[in-house]
């Protein structure tokens, strides 16, 4: 999944902080622990790293809550299938809700394309449905895997720090 608080394909590009502001606001005002895991692959735009660094760096102003950013990278494999070897998951999961979408997280995907998204909750909004539990399990599996690295393992241009 790609993330940018801007349009990517519109001309001229424009700033679109809807999600960016929401992540910062819930961490700052409600003490929520936000974890973002984005894909890192051959087609990752260099500009994405500065946006993700900005979210991670916001932690220094938080007295409670947090924002943690990780990059998930599927290992290279000697195969020439275009747009493969990437984690294409696009979802958000909370304690009791899952939001699943076909859209990358940038303005154009929500304002100019015909993607689809849906929200899943338990019958009682305080309960976690089995699907939400499963989506949360997939997230935690990937988050804790060897393929998930802190944004700080990469420089501002996306080059690995060694």
Language model features with spans:
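PLD/PLD-like phosphodiesterase catalytic module centered on the HKD motif
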Residues: 3-162
